[in-house]
UniProtKB/Swiss-Prot annotation:
Organism: Dictyostelium discoideum
Keyword Coiled coil: yes
Sequence ranges assigned to domain BUB1 N-terminal in this UniProt record: 47-211
Gene symbol of the encoding locus: bub1
Protein name: Probable inactive serine/threonine-protein kinase bub1
Family indicated by similarity: Belongs to the protein kinase superfamily. Ser/Thr protein kinase family. BUB1 subfamily.
Amino acid sequence: MSSLSDWENTKENIVPLKTGRDPTKLALFAKQTNQSDEELEKEKQKFEIIINEYQGEDPIDNWLKYIKWVQQSYPGGNMKEQLIVLLERCTRLFLSTEKYKNDPRYLRIWITYADMCRDPIEVFSFLEVQRIGFYLSLLYEARAIVYENKGNYEQADKSFKQGIERKAQPIERLQQKHLDFERRLIARLKHQQQHQQLQQQQQQQNDQLEQQQLDENGNTKLTRSALGTISSSSVHSERKSQQTKGLPLGNSTIDKKRKVGNDQKNNLGFQIFDDEKGGSTTNEVLTDSKFFGSSRKAAALMAAGQTQQTSQMKWDELEPELNKHKENTQLSQKWSDVKLLQKKQKITTAGFQIYCDQDSLSNNNNGSNNNNNNNNNENIPLSPDKLRVHSSKQQSKLEQIQNNPLANFPKVSTSNSSSSSSSSTNKSTSTTTVTTTKNERVGYNKPLFTKENEKHEISFEEYRASLFKKKLIEKQEQQNKKIEKEKEELDIKLKQEQKEQKEKEQKEKEQKEKEELEIKLKQEQQEKELQYQQHQQKQYQQKQQQQQSYNPPSPTMTIHTKQAFHDVMAMFSEPLEFEKNNKSTSSSSSLQLNNVPSSPNPFTESTLMKSTIDNNKNDNNNNNNNNNNNNNNKNTDVSFDEKSIEDQENIDPNQGGGGGNNDGNPLLSSKITNRDVLMKQLFSKDEDEGNQFDQERDMVKTIERIDLLVKGKDTPKFEIFEDSTLASSQLHSKSVSLADKVASKNKQLNPLEQSQNPLKKSILGSSGINGINGNNGGFTIFQDQPNQEKKQPLQQSQLQNPLKNSILGISDANGNGGGGGSGSGSGGFTIFQDQAAEEKKPFNEKEQQQQEEKEKENKIEEEEEEEEKDKEKEINYQNITGNITSTIDPTTVIICSLTPDDGIVNPYLIDHQYLLEQHVSATVQSIQSFFNVGDDLAPLPEQLDQCEPNQLFEDNSIIVQWPFSDITVNFTKCVCKSTMDGSMTFKVERIDDLAMTTSEDSWLSCKVQDPPSIWEFYIGNQIHQRLQERSLTISNSKFPTIHSLYYYTDKSIMLMDHTIDQGTLDDVVSSTNGVPMEEPLAMFHCIELLKMIEDLHLVGIIHGNICANNLHFLFGQTSDWPDWTAGECKGAWKSKGFTLTDFSRSIDTTIYSQDARYQSPIELLPIGTPLEWLKINQSSTTNVGWSYNLDYLGICKVMFHILTCGKEELKLSLSQQTGKLEIINQSIIQKDSFSELDTLWLPFLTTLLNHNGENGNQQTTTTTYILKQQRNLFENYLQSNPVKSKIKSLLRIQNIKLFESMKSKQ
């Protein structure tokens, strides 16, 4: 600011602000010039431009800056004119914006606007109706302050209480303000009481003073007033001069009271003068107190006629007052007893204004000119109506807004009465009426016949013409507006089309880029998969070579597949004792598994033989050099090098002679037979005797010489024998659980490390391993006879435990059994291995006798042990995945148990799934609807591998006929593709003749799995079989029927019921369009789901992937459909509910021990599994794994999906206080739709989420009991509330909505 004097001169015109003012703005205000005004206008225009061009999400921010700028830039009185208009614009602009109705910034603008108006209460009532600031404490606080300032403390208190009841925020501030208001109210009441007491005390003091001023006779002492006359001492008169009529100086309340008392005394009657009395000797006359100044008491005595005279007057000395002012004197009397007649007054109304011409006005004015006439016309008084209009026009905007702040706002319902009253007053003022005594009323609407800019009236015809012109103008304007609107709409449409085209182009580009990226990613994934497969194959070959060369596989595996045969062959990987050469050739003729020649064996794999042949080529070249050197020496002894043994099958026994010259060619050497090897190594006979055996015996193959050694030698390395105790203990083994025996055996044995067998891609060969029928019960494991006969189904008791059948040698009618049992039914067998034999020394009779004695002693000990074991009548089982001891009983039956010693299983690993399929392969092969086509490729076109979900195929474009059956199908649509195992599901139609003649549904679902798998087919058949055994026919219909499975080398194809077109539970939820499902209907779906999972757990199956997409809706029948009752399933209710599909991740708990637990990484678990649930069920100290509670989690996810209309997935957190799982996002469930949320739904979800599913051996019964208990809670609630149990009508409505939504999707 320039100087202090400038500030002193202008500070009185500055309006103070609570926030203070900017000194720079004040400096500009001190020096107001034209430039400063122009700068203010420029800044104002900038703000207007910013507000108009703003396109952000918070436009009120610019208005707040604009308002603050006006308050700072206009510090004088003109701020109100600028500010109130700006506030009105801002409040009117955001009136219909919902997000600002409870914004404190917008509410402060309204309060500032109300503060500048003359009646803020009207503004607050408007805010109440519009619900602006409804939940903000500032509204109630400001309204209470207004009422308090007006003295309406009751309304102020109500305003505070109303805000507290509505829980306006911040509630603490509002409560504190209410307490402050109560304190002020109490203080104000105390102050008023004190003030009243002071007034009473002052009044009492005044009364005492007045009494003190009375004399002894009761008269007040006369006090001299200013400019008054002094009465004589002889005359007691109150007459004063006329100057005393004005108020005397120093007038007090005592003088007023005395004056009032005197007036009351003057009301006494007037005594008439009596001449007789006046002529008496005393010459005294009693007069009225008004003239003689007697007191009230004396006047009363005189009126009563008492003889006592207090005041006297001598007429000779003073003229009486009556004679002096006789005409102006009026007797005083009581006005209440007098009726005054008044004249009738005419009702004055606004007269009819007569129109006056200018000529007549000019004639009336004297000495008027034309200019004077014009000036006089302006001074003509206007009518009352025009005065009102004129006065309203002269009002400024500030006054107009202050008087009517809501004039430009929409009217609300609360102001209807006021608006109606105002309109009626306007009508009355706009029309001038003239009334007569006869109550006649003549109306005349003068503004209709007067133009706005002119003062003369118009005729009726002119008025009609003006109305017609207005209508024409309005029509033209409307037409012009329509044309403009059409143009604008066309422009908008064109712009939208251009935008849509651009968006389409961008989307197409993005889709192309996405497709290219997806193709690249697929290619990269395929390359990685190929690399991974190649890497696995290499590792597999390396492991196989290492195991075969160094660590022969355990001889404790049960032989019932081709894989077992290869494992047994691996036992003979090292050269036999008699195959070792003499000292001269022993170093160069060692035989290993990698050098085994490629013999025509049907059990060997082509891929494995190719690798071994390639490896043998280099070794054979090296061995040939050694063989040539040995042959050049012309030694008569037979050379058992590797090359000679490898080429034995290609040598003709008739060619060549023993010890003949071969001319350095090793291929011309004589045929080496099994007999030559035995005689040379064991009995050290010469070459002639070996040649005799060559002539007597046929040539043998490499495998046959091993068999010959096993049969002919007394002390073999490996022995295969039959156990006669198995046949007697077969019945006993059926009654005892297989897993319990394995567990009891594992506890007795000491663990040692044992490696597992390598995996193979195909677990089913083209034919099984069949036993050789014979009378003596002997057999060989090296034969594989083709089985072309039809498979016969096994008996029910044999299907229950396929592993036991394979071990105990139970065979079907064709001799197909577990592990190659003989057709005579002589029992199972065991492979065991003795200790490695020492190297052979030269033959000695003493040593031979010692060996025979030792063998006899060993046989006696073994017989005693066998007798003791027969008395126990139990068979010990050994787990192939577990560990074995160094000493194994040769009569022990060793089986493949899939439960480790610690009882924790990872069921989703590839290795474990391969063992599972091996385990159930015998059961699957016995099913009639299973077709093993393992030697062929799947007859599916490549087009199916490249299709996408929901892709339709042309009619009859893909037709496939399945082998071993007359079924022919037509592929019509690709339904879905699984993200878990990569399987694809298609919709197919049967077009064969059998489907046309039968009444069965021709539509089926075809599931293609790559790599092939039999697990889902096994689970589906086991569910139906076990439910049928338990007579659960109703639940049996809730699971899909699997018609057949075709097992190829590259894929497995499964045909089953088609339920996808009926819709899933996800489709049911989405058909409601975001509206929550009716609570009774949600309870019905929950009851059906719990019942279905309860029966599934009862038969020992864990589904493992319960979700909304795997629950397919059943429309069911409509005939014989009674009302729903709890615990009953009659009529059409049997076909209602859902069908559970996708058993690829299911677990058969009967295969494992009863106390087995399961663990798996989160990548292999179902999608959406919460990490907190996995932590508490796998990594905690109490729960080392999960079991049936995996399905509990699926049930909770499905029901949460229903309760939230599919908006969010289930989110969990671990409570630190209770250590239990809690639902984080339960607040999104609408309590209005689900009234039993706190009493039923949330306890139900938390109970299942925190249940671990284990209770020792009673696990299955415990899980079913928990599900049944929760199901009974919902059934009891619906049964106790019959109004809410009208499920039938609700289900009909849901069926219609789902049918319409599914039809629209198709």
